[in-house]
Amino acid sequence: EVSWDEAISRASSELNNLKGEILFIASPFSTLEDNYALKKFAKIIFKSDNVFYVPYIDESFEDKLIKKSDKTPNSNGLKLLGINPISEKHIENLKEGKYKIIYLINDDINRIPEGNNFLKKVDINIHHLNIKNAYSDKVTVVFPESTYAEINGTFVNFQNRVQRIKPAVVTLEQERLIGEYSISRLDKFGAPNDSWSHGTRFNARPTWKVLTKIAKSLGYEFNFENSEEVFIELCNSIPGMNGWDYDTIGSMGKTV
């Protein structure tokens, strides 16, 4: 375990010394903001379109009421961003050792088919994770990623309705947007001996925030101060969403 600055420095160094191609793995479990930041990171800094995600489809799960075969919350968001499912071609490239770095956010690398056949051929792994998996101890750099209950952000449901999420759990570096997430009376007036006012605050960050730091260390300014600024920029890149902000989404969401 190291500090955030040390982890960011190590990731930046590995990316700066790149000898080969990078495969970026986006996440259907993450927000529009995090996935957009990853796509921008790949395109602006590395001139790469190698950004894909791993679907999670279970046809037996779907019913005629509310359950869908797609068991992820934001695959429609990835489609909106122009991020496609990983193809057989790219899995073959992995097995052939074409990609020397895998940069993955909020997913289990073992969900990529035939993982055992390519992981040993990848030199560097940089992952953003909020839960450990069977491979995470072997990863070069792991950034602790905030969960959906700790962040501001947006998802797109199966009806293409963009919906807000807001933090319900406090982290060490809690983002507070203007007019939102005020301190409750319980938190404000909790006495030192009140256990409910001293819950664990995890040292985690949203992916977009870490990518902004890494980009800066590599000489690029993303100029994102909060999640809404990421959202506004991504909306201006998508037909039909130009000019949207979090107020546009509101509490009921908005269909795109």
Q: Locations of the language-model features?
A:
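Non-catalytic alpha/beta scaffold blocks inside enzyme catalytic domains
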Residues: 1-10, 14-20, 32-240
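A broadly structural signal marking compact, well-ordered functional cores
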Residues: 239-247
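Active-site-proximal loop/turn and secondary-structure-junction residues that shape catalytic pockets
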Residues: 28-30
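Short glycine-rich phosphate-binding loop at a beta-alpha junction
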Residues: 21-26
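Acidic, Ser/Thr-rich low-complexity intrinsically disordered segments
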Residues: 247-256
